């Protein structure tokens, strides 16, 4: 978990960012990622109730829901963020960028342990896209705005 690395990622990927202090104080998506990273620490040591409480507080303040069970790689960024949902068994690689109102969710049909999507490295998912179910999105993929991906 590197807050410094997260700040560098936002500076590289978001052209509207002017300063590190601006990210720390106002970048909604980054706040959500930081809250996720803290909740994930509690999840990994089996303090799941604490992790879920932290996650819910984060959702209240940011409008972004990231389940603490999700696995997220380095240099992950959510731009704008509000309405984004990342499910419990989602796996997200390195250098992934999500825009607002993206859902990495389940379909209700997958009854096994893995119910949510896996995104490889260098994936970009545009605003409003829904990626549902236990599916695999390959390296360097770009998912368009408002796309619904089921297979």
Locations of the language-model features?
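Left-handed beta-helix
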Residues: 62, 67-68, 73-74, 79-88, ...
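Terminal amphipathic alpha-helical/low-complexity segments used for targeting or macromolecular assembly
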Residues: 1-62
